[in-house]
Amino acid sequence: MKKHLLMVAMAFAMSTQAATTQPERVAATQLKPIAAQTQAAVWASRVMGRYHYKATPLDDAMSEKIFDKYFESLDGEKLFFVQADIDKFAPVRDKLDDAINNENLTIPFSIYSVYQARFAERIGHARELLKTKMDFTVDESMQLDREKAAWPKDDAEMKDLWRKRVKNDWLRLKLAGKEDKAIRETLDKRYDNYQTRVRK
C-alpha cells in the first residue's frame, strides 16, 4: 500500500478535477491540475518520505514505478496506447519526483489527456466496425489476456486488434442466440457506455 500512496493521491486529484467537469465538455477540454491537486501530491510524497514506518523516498526510482503503474492503471490490457505514446513520455519516466516536488502536475495530466484521446479513437473505430459485415470464414486468433502483451507498435496494429476484439464480442453474442440487428445494437450501446464512463 505504501508504494501506491502517491499514485492514489494523484489519481484522486485527477478524479476530483474530472468530476467537476461537465461530461459533454471533457473531450474538448484538456484537463489541467488545480492548486489543491498539486498540494495533495506534494503532501502524499512528504508523508511517504517522512512519516511512514518504512520511509519511501520520492526519487527517480520511485518516479519510474509510479510512471509504470500509472500507465498500467489507465491501460492494463494495452488496448488504447500505442508504443509511440509510451515512447513520447519515456524521457520523463524518472522525472515525476521533480515535477511533484516543484508542484507541477503537467506530466500526469498530459498522459491522461492522450489516454482520453486514444480511448475516443478506439471506441469510435469499434463503433464504425459494427456497421460492417463480420467475416467468420477467416482462421485467426487473438490474445484475450493482454496484460503481458507488448504495446501495439502503431495505429494499424491497434486497429487490427480492435477488429478482432469487436469480432470476438459479436461472436459471443451470436453464439448466445442473438440476431445480427440485436448484436449491433447491444454492442453499440456497450461501447457508447464505455465512452461515457471515461468522460466522467
Task: Indicate residue ranges for each PLM-predicted region.
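Flexible, low-complexity junctional segments that flank or bridge functional domains
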Residues: H4, A18-K200
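Gram-negative bacterial Sec-dependent N-terminal signal peptides
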Residues: K2-Q17
